[in-house]
UniProtKB/Swiss-Prot annotation:
Organism: Methanococcus vannielii (strain ATCC 35089 / DSM 1224 / JCM 13029 / OCM 148 / SB)
UniProt similarity note: Belongs to the aTrm56 family.
Subunit structure: Homodimer.
Gene Ontology biological-process annotations: tRNA nucleoside ribose methylation
Entry GO CC: cytoplasm
Catalytic activity reported: cytidine(56) in tRNA + S-adenosyl-L-methionine = 2'-O-methylcytidine(56) in tRNA + S-adenosyl-L-homocysteine + H(+)
Name of the protein described by the UniProt record: tRNA (cytidine(56)-2'-O)-methyltransferase
Length: 180
Protein backbone atom coordinates (compact mmCIF):
# COMPACT_ATOMS: atom_id res chain seq x y z
CA UNK A 1 0.00 0.00 0.00
CA UNK A 2 1.35 3.41 -0.94
CA UNK A 3 0.89 5.95 1.87
CA UNK A 4 1.88 9.61 1.88
CA UNK A 5 1.59 12.10 4.75
CA UNK A 6 0.87 15.81 4.26
CA UNK A 7 1.80 18.04 7.20
CA UNK A 8 -0.13 21.30 6.85
CA UNK A 9 1.72 24.16 8.45
CA UNK A 10 5.04 24.19 10.22
CA UNK A 11 6.00 26.94 12.62
CA UNK A 12 9.78 26.96 12.30
CA UNK A 13 11.63 26.71 15.58
CA UNK A 14 8.47 25.89 17.52
CA UNK A 15 7.55 22.83 15.41
CA UNK A 16 10.87 21.38 14.22
CA UNK A 17 10.95 18.62 16.84
CA UNK A 18 7.31 17.58 16.45
CA UNK A 19 7.53 17.78 12.65
CA UNK A 20 10.58 15.52 12.77
CA UNK A 21 8.60 13.08 14.95
CA UNK A 22 5.71 13.21 12.45
CA UNK A 23 8.11 12.29 9.64
CA UNK A 24 9.85 9.51 11.58
CA UNK A 25 6.55 8.04 12.76
CA UNK A 26 5.27 8.13 9.18
CA UNK A 27 8.34 6.27 7.94
CA UNK A 28 8.34 3.73 10.78
CA UNK A 29 4.69 2.80 10.30
CA UNK A 30 4.46 2.37 6.56
CA UNK A 31 4.40 5.72 4.75
CA UNK A 32 6.60 6.23 1.69
CA UNK A 33 6.63 10.02 1.60
CA UNK A 34 6.24 13.07 3.85
CA UNK A 35 5.06 16.35 2.36
CA UNK A 36 5.45 19.75 3.98
CA UNK A 37 4.06 23.13 3.00
CA UNK A 38 7.34 24.87 3.80
CA UNK A 39 11.01 23.97 3.96
CA UNK A 40 12.82 23.27 7.21
CA UNK A 41 16.44 22.29 6.69
CA UNK A 42 16.74 20.80 10.19
CA UNK A 43 13.75 18.48 9.71
CA UNK A 44 14.85 17.46 6.20
CA UNK A 45 18.40 16.65 7.35
CA UNK A 46 17.16 14.64 10.35
CA UNK A 47 14.85 12.57 8.16
CA UNK A 48 17.48 12.00 5.47
CA UNK A 49 20.04 10.96 8.10
CA UNK A 50 17.63 8.38 9.56
CA UNK A 51 16.78 6.96 6.13
CA UNK A 52 20.47 6.69 5.26
CA UNK A 53 21.25 4.79 8.48
CA UNK A 54 18.10 2.73 8.94
CA UNK A 55 17.35 2.07 5.27
CA UNK A 56 14.29 1.95 3.12
CA UNK A 57 12.84 4.41 0.67
CA UNK A 58 11.22 7.44 2.23
CA UNK A 59 10.92 10.75 0.44
CA UNK A 60 10.80 14.27 1.88
CA UNK A 61 9.13 16.90 -0.31
CA UNK A 62 8.01 20.49 0.01
CA UNK A 63 4.90 21.49 -1.95
CA UNK A 64 4.28 24.78 -3.70
CA UNK A 65 0.51 24.29 -3.48
CA UNK A 66 -0.90 21.69 -1.12
CA UNK A 67 -4.43 22.20 -2.52
CA UNK A 68 -3.31 21.41 -6.08
CA UNK A 69 -1.44 18.35 -4.85
CA UNK A 70 -4.46 17.04 -2.93
CA UNK A 71 -6.83 17.65 -5.87
CA UNK A 72 -4.51 15.76 -8.22
CA UNK A 73 -3.98 12.95 -5.69
CA UNK A 74 -7.76 12.44 -5.42
CA UNK A 75 -7.85 11.41 -9.11
CA UNK A 76 -6.06 8.17 -8.20
CA UNK A 77 -6.23 7.85 -4.43
CA UNK A 78 -8.05 8.42 -1.17
CA UNK A 79 -7.49 11.46 1.03
CA UNK A 80 -7.90 11.06 4.78
CA UNK A 81 -7.73 14.03 7.13
CA UNK A 82 -6.98 13.25 10.78
CA UNK A 83 -8.79 15.73 13.00
CA UNK A 84 -10.29 15.71 16.48
CA UNK A 85 -13.54 16.88 14.88
CA UNK A 86 -14.02 14.07 12.34
CA UNK A 87 -15.92 10.80 12.38
CA UNK A 88 -14.97 8.26 15.03
CA UNK A 89 -12.14 6.08 13.68
CA UNK A 90 -13.74 3.02 15.32
CA UNK A 91 -16.90 3.52 13.26
CA UNK A 92 -15.27 4.27 9.90
CA UNK A 93 -11.98 2.36 9.68
CA UNK A 94 -13.62 -0.81 8.38
CA UNK A 95 -15.14 1.15 5.48
CA UNK A 96 -11.79 2.78 4.71
CA UNK A 97 -10.00 -0.58 4.62
CA UNK A 98 -12.73 -2.14 2.44
CA UNK A 99 -12.47 0.70 -0.06
CA UNK A 100 -8.69 0.38 -0.20
CA UNK A 101 -8.79 -3.41 -0.53
CA UNK A 102 -11.30 -3.17 -3.36
CA UNK A 103 -9.39 -0.58 -5.37
CA UNK A 104 -5.72 -0.73 -4.24
CA UNK A 105 -5.65 3.06 -4.15
CA UNK A 106 -2.82 5.10 -2.67
CA UNK A 107 -3.57 7.00 0.53
CA UNK A 108 -2.79 10.61 1.42
CA UNK A 109 -3.12 11.41 5.12
CA UNK A 110 -3.44 15.08 6.08
CA UNK A 111 -2.44 16.26 9.55
CA UNK A 112 -2.17 19.82 10.78
CA UNK A 113 0.42 21.74 12.72
CA UNK A 114 -1.80 24.73 13.26
CA UNK A 115 -5.41 25.57 12.47
CA UNK A 116 -6.24 23.52 9.40
CA UNK A 117 -7.91 25.42 6.55
CA UNK A 118 -11.54 24.53 5.78
CA UNK A 119 -10.47 23.32 2.33
CA UNK A 120 -8.69 20.34 3.90
CA UNK A 121 -11.99 19.14 5.38
CA UNK A 122 -13.77 19.67 2.08
CA UNK A 123 -11.12 17.95 -0.05
CA UNK A 124 -10.80 14.89 2.20
CA UNK A 125 -12.71 11.72 1.39
CA UNK A 126 -12.72 10.99 5.12
CA UNK A 127 -12.32 13.29 8.11
CA UNK A 128 -11.40 10.91 10.93
CA UNK A 129 -11.01 11.56 14.62
CA UNK A 130 -8.63 9.46 16.68
CA UNK A 131 -10.20 10.13 20.05
CA UNK A 132 -12.14 13.14 21.28
CA UNK A 133 -9.60 14.44 23.80
CA UNK A 134 -6.66 16.75 23.09
CA UNK A 135 -3.46 14.89 22.17
CA UNK A 136 -0.59 15.02 19.71
CA UNK A 137 -0.91 14.67 15.96
CA UNK A 138 1.95 12.16 16.26
CA UNK A 139 -0.26 9.94 18.43
CA UNK A 140 -3.19 10.22 16.01
CA UNK A 141 -0.94 9.43 13.06
CA UNK A 142 0.64 6.42 14.77
CA UNK A 143 -2.71 4.93 15.77
CA UNK A 144 -4.20 5.51 12.33
CA UNK A 145 -1.22 4.08 10.41
CA UNK A 146 -1.04 1.04 12.68
CA UNK A 147 -4.72 0.32 12.09
CA UNK A 148 -4.41 0.95 8.36
CA UNK A 149 -1.44 -1.40 7.97
CA UNK A 150 -2.70 -3.93 10.50
CA UNK A 151 0.56 -3.61 12.42
CA UNK A 152 2.59 -5.13 9.58
CA UNK A 153 4.87 -2.10 9.15
CA UNK A 154 6.07 -1.98 12.76
CA UNK A 155 8.93 -4.43 12.24
CA UNK A 156 10.00 -3.57 8.71
CA UNK A 157 13.47 -4.62 7.64
CA UNK A 158 15.42 -2.95 4.84
CA UNK A 159 18.24 -4.52 2.82
CA UNK A 160 20.11 -1.21 2.67
CA UNK A 161 19.99 -0.57 6.44
CA UNK A 162 23.27 0.20 8.20
CA UNK A 163 21.58 -0.14 11.59
CA UNK A 164 19.02 -2.78 12.57
CA UNK A 165 17.38 -3.72 15.86
CA UNK A 166 16.22 -7.26 16.55
CA UNK A 167 13.49 -7.59 19.18
CA UNK A 168 14.74 -9.35 22.30
CA UNK A 169 13.26 -10.18 25.67
CA UNK A 170 16.35 -9.40 27.77
CA UNK A 171 18.97 -7.44 25.86
CA UNK A 172 19.66 -4.83 23.22
CA UNK A 173 20.28 -6.51 19.88
CA UNK A 174 21.64 -3.89 17.51
CA UNK A 175 23.50 -4.61 14.28
CA UNK A 176 25.68 -1.88 12.80
CA UNK A 177 27.22 -2.43 9.38
CA UNK A 178 29.92 0.08 8.58
CA UNK A 179 30.66 1.03 5.02
CA UNK A 180 27.34 -0.16 3.69
Amino acid sequence: MHIEILRLGHRGERDKRISTHVALTSRAIGAKKILFTEEDKHVRESVERIVKSWGGEFKFEVLNSWKSYVKKFKDEGIVIHLTMYGENINNVMTDVKKELAKNSKPVLVIIGAEKVPREAYDLADYNLSVGNQPHSEVAALAIFLDRLTGGTALYSEYNDAKIAVTPSKFEKCVSVEKGK
